[in-house]
């Protein structure tokens, strides 16, 4: 399937082993496709980062979006899917998570699809939510 592709969405997690695997796939996409063999250029690549947690990235407990997209893989980010309980629930129920429209993961997949189809959408659920005034007051 990869050989005949015109575009590819590389899916990775914000952890080193997953990003390394994605880097190997990108190398294959850049060297082993029909387009490359026929000197028609490279296929268009997009990045989807799953299981992202902005709080953990902010604390440097996981790679950031820029670490992955700009510094390591150098592939534009199409979507970022936050870590969300609805992913496990959807899997257990045999339903696509995109149908969970009230959940952050469902909304983020919907945004990703819209961007892939050419629509401009802001990136949601990728920054640390500001603490409320009570949490700031009591240091929680």
Model-derived features: where do they sit?
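C-terminal boundary of histidine-terminating zinc-finger modules
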Residues: 91-108
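Short beta->alpha linker loops
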Residues: 14, 82-85, 104
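A short, charged, Gly/Pro-tolerant segment at domain boundaries
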Residues: 125-140
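Active-site phosphate-binding and catalytic loops of NTP-dependent enzymes
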Residues: 34, 123-124
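Beta-strand-loop-alpha "switch" segments that mediate conformational coupling across diverse proteins
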Residues: 68-96
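Residue-level signature of catalytic and energy-coupling elements of molecular machines
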Residues: 22, 81, 109
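Extended, charge-rich low-complexity interaction segments
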Residues: 104-123
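Conserved catalytic-core segment of NTP-binding enzymes
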Residues: 1-76
